[in-house]
Amino acid sequence: MGELAFLIFGRVIPGAVFVFLATVQVQLLAPELKVAYNDASNIGAITLIINRLLFLAFVSAVAMIYVFRKPPALGRREPIAFAVSMYASFVLLALGPVADFIHAPVAFNSSPTAILVSNVLLISGFALAAYSLAYLRFNFSILPEARAMVTGGPYRLVRHPIYLGEIIAGFGLVVTLLSWFSLAVLISFIAAQLYRTYIEEGVLVEAIPGYAAYRLKTPHRLIPGVI
């Protein structure tokens, strides 16, 4: 990738996308903070605010990473790699709007229990993703790219903890949007994340000496002792 192409597609466009996502979270926070201020015992509102703040921290950090990170040592740009990476990164964010557009049978479950469970899962997922990002830092990328190997923190337990956090958050989202359509989207999202790990690790093994040994030392991609 040339310098101009990297500037446009590796910095400006993805950075702008995550700045937009951060801006949306800030706008959504204002009325939710007002609700929590007026009713400090509203656990649903408080957990939703925590969820928003964690997601805001995550997307803000990603936006900054895209501005300052270096070009990759190696990357894959094939259509399948691009499509899977984009789908896994953004499909859950588009679940509600797409369901409305195609008139899918998705109804919001507003019961206090569903909202609480949803927010706990969302908070857990975003917290894990943000914690993992603090270790991955400027090596983060949506597309399959190799910059440096990270083995500390959550990467001692699994090789793709950010994706695990996103999957946990995905379950949290679907709890309040439960339908056959949302379940199908969630299953396809998890499948895309799994396939994404195979594509990325092919790049990392090829570009980074020692990554093959790290895979042997840390044998699980997403869940310790399972997969």
Which residue stretches match the model-derived regions?
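Alpha-helical membrane segments in multi-pass integral membrane proteins
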Residues: 165, 171-172
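Solvent-exposed interhelical
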Residues: 147-165
